[in-house]
Every structure is written in structure tokens, then in C-alpha cells.
């Protein structure tokens, strides 16, 4: 997710065309500290809060990079491809994902965020063994079909942050 979001920003900065849609599954949107879930959801999630800070340090390496330079949430998010984001409500990243979706929307990006309340980081990997995973994967397929002109209906079982595709826009 982090790489996909940062790539969208760099593609736009290079003046290249954006894709029809960007999918972000449980994206890491801030390399610093953000939100209570980052450490408060450690008891639920296989990915732990301290790991996000460690990964941020690895990403910086010996370079002069700051969290702001490496965090999708700190970028100019206007004029990006439409974004469809999925997250688990029990994952450590959920607060920063919500913050990112709100910030992208505030900057004019078309965003849809679906949060499955009892799921952890990248719950999609469970496939057909969990109904929520299967529902999320079905929604991803619908999002891809949306780029071809089909409708993409809101999901009733997920938390909604009032950002959706129901008006024909992402």
C-alpha cells in the first residue's frame, strides 16, 4: 500500500498519466507515529506498532529523509487516481489509514474507504476461509469493474467514513 500510494504521487509529479484506479489494502500511510491504534491494537494484530517505526528507520537508511518525505499522508494528494482503500478495524494501521483517506478527500482526491470492524492487517490473505475476506476480494473485483463503467455499490457490513462511490465518482 505504501509503495502504491507513493508511486501515484511520483507519477503525478513526473507529469505521467494516472491509472484508472488505485487499490490500497491496509496501506502504511505514515512512517512516524499516528493514531491510538498504532500501538493500541498490538493485542489484536500480528503486525505490531513498534514494527512500523522500525520499518520507517529502515526505509530512511542513511539518507537525509524525513517522515514527511516518506509518508503518503504528508504528500500533495490532489489529482491522484481514484483511490479504493480497504482496512481492518483491529489492525494497527487503521487510524492512520482513516486519517489518510480524510486528508486525500480534503485535498480533492476521489476516495472510498471500507473498514471491516473485526479484521486485522491484510485480512484479505485468508481468502475463502473468512467471509469478510471473501467480501473484501469481491469488492476489489467490483472496484476494478467500476473502471469499465459498472456500478460499485456501498457495502453495508463495513464501517463507512462517508467517502464512497455511490454518486458515480470514487
Task: Give the role of each language-model region.
Residues 1-170:
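Alpha/beta-hydrolase superfamily serine-hydrolase fold, recognizing
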